[in-house]
Amino acid sequence: NVVGIVGNAFKQTMAQLEHERVGIDRLVSNQALYELALERADRSDPRVRQEIAAIETGYRIGRILVTREVLRQAPAGFSAATKCFCTEHEIRVADFVAATFGADAMLWDDVTHGVVYAPGYTIMGGTSNIMRNILGERVLGLPREPR
């Protein structure tokens, strides 16, 4: 069985990766943990409020980016930017969760998993560095990086 056209595997793989990079899971995989952290967060601290505002803004921007991709309103190759943004956002959420729970983060399996797994988001679907290269070369038209 062949998916796509025989001899066109690389192009088919690139098309599949475009789809993988923009799934909503890129944005919301730690959202339940974030909501738990919100319950424990010290909202009297202005730095905590600032971080909450940044995360909430990130969720809104991420939803717009993912929606544009799904509706095919984004330029070709822009999924790399969406993936980078959502990945960085998920790491920010994991950092907030870890800071909010403190040492208790290591006592809850779900929290521990979310915090420890977060750096992996920069690898799945292509590393963030590769995504930046794709964005520069395919979207912005910058010259290729020397090989």
Where are these regions (language model features)?
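Catalytic-loop motifs flanking and including active-site residues across diverse enzymes
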Residues: 9, 29, 58-61, 82, ...
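Generic structural signal for hydrophobic core residues of well-folded globular domains
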Residues: 37, 56, 73, 97-101, ...
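Generic, well-ordered alpha-helical scaffold segments in large soluble proteins
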Residues: 16, 36, 40, 65-68, ...
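Generic recognition of well-ordered alpha-helical segments
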Residues: 12, 33-36, 85, 92, ...
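C-terminal helix-coil-helix/basic helical segment that borders enzyme active sites and/or dimer interfaces
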Residues: 46-49, 59-110
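Glycine-rich phosphate/cofactor-binding loops in nucleotide/flavin-utilizing enzymes
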Residues: 2-24, 101-147
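Glycine-rich beta->alpha junctions and the first turn(s) of the following alpha-helix
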Residues: 1-62, 121
